[in-house]
């Protein structure tokens, strides 16, 4: 049982770390988008090179924003049975009857808990894998955005 708890904690820690990185980098992504919007008049009046760089920058910014949202809001598969350790399943099952929820949770036997924990590890690992995939794509798009923002800054000086 301790091994499962350790694995569960490790997977959840990776998910938390991914979310924290996404929030930090996402704020810079949004700041870059605001910079683009503030300077749109200057960009439109500039030459063709600046406009092309701006278009590439906007595309990279939008792509990064989409990947950022996919990192923060992963889709969950709902084909698993109701879990006694997943907060949403617990809340949905006992929202109207908290006392029954407390009683039912106290009655969970070790084998049932072990199975629910293993199921949650699998589900969270799938979420972590998706987040990892989208973080890689976000970083690529964000890198293109940073490069093009730098080129825009130089061309507008």
Question: Which residues does each predicted region cover?
Answer:
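Context-gated lysine
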Residues: 5, 21, 42, 81-84, ...
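Short, charged/polar, low-complexity loop and linker segments
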Residues: 1-8, 44, 103-110
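A hydrophobic membrane-anchoring alpha-helix module
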Residues: 109-157
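A structural signal for alpha-helical segments
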Residues: 6, 47-50, 112, 116
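Short amphipathic alpha-helical coupling elements at transmembrane boundaries
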Residues: 2, 6-20, 85, 119-133
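Alpha-helical transmembrane segments and their immediate juxtamembrane boundary regions
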Residues: 9, 13-80, 136-157
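Short secondary-structure boundary micro-motifs
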Residues: 7-8, 54-55, 88-89, 110
